[in-house]
Amino acid sequence: MAYAEITPDGSVRHASFQGMRADKKASQVVLETLVDVGSALDPATGNEIAGAVGVKLSHPDKTMYPNTPITKAHLAAYYAAVANRMLPHIKDRPLSLVRDTDNDLQKTFFQKHALPGMPRTLKSGQLTKIKGTESRILWIEDLAGLIGGVQMNTLEFHVWGSDRHTPDLPERLVFDIDPDEGLDFEHVKQAAVDIRDILGAIGLQSWPLVSGGKGVHVVVPLLPEADWIAVKDFCRDFAELLAKTEPQRFIANMSKARRKGRIFLDYLRNGQGSTAICPWSTRARAGGTVAVPVTWEELDGMDRANCFDIFAAAAKAQGPDAWEGYFQAQQTLTDQMQAVVKR
C-alpha cells in the first residue's frame, strides 16, 4: 500500500493498493519505522503520494527553486509531511495562489479564481461579501488540494481570515511586522514581543509566525463573532496607536519612502478579501523557504525569519506543536478592547 499518513487512531489516509508481496509472510509485514522527515523528503515518495490522492504530477523532476535540489515531487512530499499541521489553517478558507510558471522566481503571479485545466482537487465557487457583491473563490479541502496546487507550480498559499461557510465573520487577525530593508532582526523580534504583550494586556493571546521572508506575523485566533469592519478598525487603530506612541520605531503607512529605519505594522491583511500567508506554506523566495509557526521562546533564539527551508520545516512539523492551544482559544474582540486602542 502507498499512503499519505496513518492517523492517531490507526486509520490509513489516501491509501492506494500497489500489489501483493509474494516475498514475505503476513506476519513479517509491519509498520514502517519513523525516520527524520526533514532529511528524507523523497521525490519518489512525493510522486507516489500525488498519484494516491488523484493528482498526476507533470514533470515531477522539474526544479522549482533555482540553485536548489527542490523539485515538484519534493514539494508534494513536503506538503504530505506537513498536511496535518497545515490543513486546519487552510481547509475551506478562500485563498490566493502565488504561481511561478517559469520556475525562476522572476515572474510570479497571484491567482484567486478558477482557470481552465486546474486540478479538480482545488475547489472553486462563489460567495457573497458583506457589501453584497459576489466573489469568485478558490479553496482546498485536503492534501489532494495542496498537491493540486503543487501541480500548478504554486509556491505560496495565502488565506482569508474567515471560513467560506461564514465569510462575514473572521476567525483570526494578523499583524504583519514588515521592517525597512537593513533593519536588524532583533528589532523585528522585539516588535513582535511588544505587540504580544500589549494584546495580552487587553485580553488577547497571540502566536508568532516567521514569514519565510524578513518579517514576523503575530496571529490572534478569534471566535467568529466580531465582523470584518470591527476587526479591521481594531487592527488599524492598534497600528496607528503604536505609530503615535513610538514614531521612531513604527509606522502605520505602507509608504516605503517613509519607512526608513522603522517597521511598518501592516494591518491591511484584516479586511474581507485580503489574505495573509498560510502557516506551513512555502514562499516564492530563493532557497525554498517556508512560513513556520514557532513558539515565543523559539523566536527569541532566531536570527532571521527565513531560517526554515522545506527540509527543516518538514522535520519541525513532526515535533511538538508550536501553536499548542491556538485552535482552542476562546477569545473575541470586545467593545472594550476596541475602545482601548481607539485614541
How does the language model describe each region?
Residues 98-100, 206-212, 253-257:
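Short beta-strand
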Residues 196-209:
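Active-site palm subdomain of RNA-directed nucleic acid polymerases
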Residues 1-77, 84-87, 91-92, 132-134, ...:
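C-terminal accessory nucleic-acid interaction domains of nucleic acid-metabolism proteins
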Residues 219-231:
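Catalytic palm subdomain of template-directed nucleic-acid polymerases
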Residues 210-220:
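Short, conserved phosphate-binding/catalytic loop or strand-edge motifs used
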Residues 93-125:
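Polyanion/phosphate-binding surface patch
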